[in-house]
Regions:
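Hydrophobic anchor at the beta1->P-loop junction of P-loop NTPases
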Residues: 27
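Post-Walker A helix-loop "phosphate-sensing" segment adjacent to the P-loop in P-loop NTPases
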Residues: 44-55
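Acidic, divalent-metal-binding catalytic cores of TOPRIM
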Residues: 88-89, 122-251
């Protein structure tokens, strides 16, 4: 299954509308933002049909996958958008990751966990928010927003480049870095980026990585940066010379 699919899920109180672009989409966010409600509405529509009071509009079937028999159920589903809530612990397993990569379905995973076995794009990590649409009615209009923007201006002038790749990509950025008198180092894989960042001194660092597969690493790479910087500032007792932050750039 390929291409973009628009999904609309609504009843007399709630209206969800969003586009699914890739085979793996992640929805994150705090409690009470409407994530579980979306799953419940889809489940009601699937089990009760028109009697549920829920309308699901999409050009492909939308299904909810859950429970201990998930693998057996998944084998019978094809060319559908499958929604899975975070209470289903199987989404963290290698077995599930293998099943996802060998199927023709799209998957919408509602979880705050980092799913390291799945290669999902940083551009397909979303949150949910209520928009101003329908604000004069009783219906709440829910839309998705990207957590990590695809347009960023680096707030620093990097003194060191760390590249996820160790092959031609690294060779390119090493050549560019040499021209700019910058140090360039390969992490030899996305899973080693975080550990390498922790070993860097107070220099400003720019990370170059493949945005199409680094989604699971983004929480670790972005959130701790300021904390690491503050800790180094305290350790050296030279706040004015410490880094003000570390930026991660996805290409």
């Amino acid at each position: 299954m390929k291409g973009l699919h628009k999904v609309i899920v609504q009843n007399n109180r709630l209206h969800y509308e969003f586009d699914i672009r890739r085979n793996i989409t992640i929805i994150q966010g705090n409690s009470a933002t409407g994530k579980t409600t979306l799953i419940n509405m889809l489940r009601q529509a699937e089990n009760l049909g028109a009697d549920s009071g829920v309308d699901v509009n999409c050009d492909v079937p939308c299904r909810v996958l859950e429970g201990r028999n998930w693998k057996v159920i998944l084998e019978s589903i094809s060319k559908s958008i499958i929604f899975i809530d975070e209470e289903n612990v199987f989404i963290n397993t290698e077995e599930f990751a293998s099943a996802v990569q060998n199927s023709d379905n799209y998957y919408v995973l509602i979880t705050r966990e980092n799913l390291y076995d799945l290669p999902y794009s940083v551009e397909e990590i979303y949150g949910l928010h209520s928009s101003g649409k329908y604000q004069n009615t009783r219906k709440v209009y829910q839309q998705m927003y990207r957590i990590y923007s695809d347009k960023n201006i680096l707030p620093i002038k990097p003194e060191k480049i760390i590249v996820e790749d160790s092959n031609s990509g690294y060779d390119f950025f090493r050549s560019v870095s040499e021209d700019q008198n910058l140090e360039c180092e390969s992490a030899h894989g996305k899973t080693k980026l975080f550990d390498l960042l922790q070993k860097v001194d107070t220099r400003q660092v720019c990370v170059i990585a493949d945005g199409a597969a680094i989604g699971a690493e983004m929480n670790r790479l972005s959130a701790p940066a300021a904390m690491i910087s503050r800790w180094r500032s305290w350790r050296t007792s030279t706040p004015a010379k410490s880094a003000t932050g570390r930026s991660s750039a996805a290409t």
